[in-house]
Amino acid sequence: VRSSAASDVYKRQKGDSVSFSLDIPVKYGTDVFVAGGGPAGVAAAVAAAESGTDVYLAESLSCFGGMGTSALVPVFMQMTDGINFLAAGFGSRVRKMLDSEKSFSGGAHDIEALKRVYDGLAEKSGAKFSFCTKVIGVKASGGKIDYAVCSGLGGIFAVKSKVFIDATGNGDLAYMAGAKYEKGGENGAMMPGSLCSMWCSIDWKKWRANRPDMPQPQSFKVKEAYEAGVFSFYDPHMTGIMEIGDGLGGGNIGHAFGVDGTDEDSVTRALLHCRKSMREYKNYYNKYLPGFENAKVAATGSAMGIRETRRFVGDYVLNIDDYMKRAVFDDEIGRYAYPIDIHPSGFKGGELEKHRMEFDRLYKYAKGESYGIPYRILTPKGFSNLYAAGRCASMDRLVHGSLRVMPGCFIMGQAAGIGASMAAASKTSVHEIDTRELQKKLIKFGAYLPNFKS
């Protein structure tokens, strides 16, 4: 493959530029290429490989799981609608394997155990994969991608594939191919990021005996602490530290406002800010919260927790009307029920109260309620062999606030993987596969599709 750094893949905005070209070896030829090994990517790779398809996955970090492992995000968010297990299929396997290791408390999960679970599922499926391997370009023409260009530890190489699945979160592969996308809200503002953390030396029994009865109880002294100078910034929205095991906790605390997860300089500033702020959070917990008097920060994530960047425009945009009417679709690949959770991008007045009202009441479903996820949100317009699965799929910003979390990514990923296998085998455009046949295969894989009628 011949590639040029000055190709139209990259739009130079300002400053100097350098032009060079090189011959890139084609290291792999495969049926399905998966960019990204987070919850959507690993689900896609496993589902495609178990369908009898040759699969290669490139993951830029050192393990599968993305935010749930490298970024230390300690919770999946809800997998059920209170009655039915919505993340069935790949999510069922993950949950069962964590349970077998006694590594899932019902809320938080053991991050090292989750890494092993993903490793085992990927290896058993027969999918090929490489860690420490980042997609840095694509070769595409006429609405069809032919090659992904990757940078690994041994240098740059290309992968030729029939079908490509973008499960990078940010939609890096689809972006480099030129697919149309939206980003953030109407004014471009995106949800803040968080740097999650691991904590030790917590007396959970004491905390449970003394915790206040209120939403986000670990935040109840934040204002007092800010006024006392413990915090150099005011951020009252704090999910908190969740119990993982004996004295251990997973922290989802603090925000990096204004971070753009597609800009390395912005993410660098966010990481610096969040690591500095951990000292302030430690002081807060030690001084104000019972059971945390001796708590210590054991580790912070090696990746920034990013909630929102690009959403690629597909054959259908899942929207707030669909969410509110608990929509059912003919091409449904699953259903989901997590409330819309858009973290405020600042606290000038009333933002947190509005968020809590929306999350706890306006957008909260009753038990057994859910909304449908149509296959068409996985297929970006303009490309015959490209899927976007995970938080970069086609949805408006409000629904993205619900579906972006890990169980939603499992549902989308497994559908993209099986769909890609079908498209590769039949040499069919991803926009034209038989969705009823896809649904049958998803049910065989274990997916929850209550509205499918055979």
Task: Report residues per predicted region.
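N-terminal glycine-rich dinucleotide-binding loop that anchors FAD/FMN and/or NAD(P) in oxidoreductases
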Residues: A71-E101, A113
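Flavin (FAD/FMN)-binding glycine-rich loop and adjacent Rossmann-like elements that form
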Residues: G152, I156-V163, A167-S454
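Gly/Ala-rich phosphate-binding loop of Rossmann-like dinucleotide-binding domains
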Residues: A45, A49
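Glycine-rich FAD pyrophosphate-binding loop
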Residues: E50-M67
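Single conserved hydrophobic/aromatic residue that forms the stacking wall/gate
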Residues: V1-Y10
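Feature captures the FAD/FMN-dependent oxidoreductase FAD-binding
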Residues: M97-A174
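Beta1/beta-strand and adjacent pyrophosphate-binding region of the FAD-binding site
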Residues: V26-G38
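N-terminal Rossmann-fold NAD(P) dinucleotide-binding loop
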Residues: G41
